[in-house]
Amino acid sequence: MNDEPLAQIEREVLGWDGVFKKRDEDGPGGIGVTGYRYGDAETGGPQIGHIHDDGHADFRFPREVRDELIRSGRAIPHPAFPNSRTTASYRIRSADDVPGALELFRMNYERRKERNGPTAKVG
């Protein structure tokens, strides 16, 4: 897979106030995972989504939102946990997939920002 779509998503998401990343080199199945969180990098914060190195992105949403995203074709059930009530997934294979992934990240970002309040940009 071309890494540019993942880099493009990272540049955009890290440009949002209060978003930082946390890298896990030994994610599920031995695949590296980059999680994007909202809050303070020192104390942590809720994840707005994560991307596996193979381009598989996962997001947790309220059940109603997750179900609507899947019904509308904007997301798919999680491949390993298809019966999860809150986890939606999205495949990033090319630059054409970037807008859809950013939409899901932005939805969770806005939800977290509303719930947790504004935060200063973390460097």
Feature names for model-found ranges:
Residues 1-123:
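Charge-dense, helix-prone N-terminal extensions
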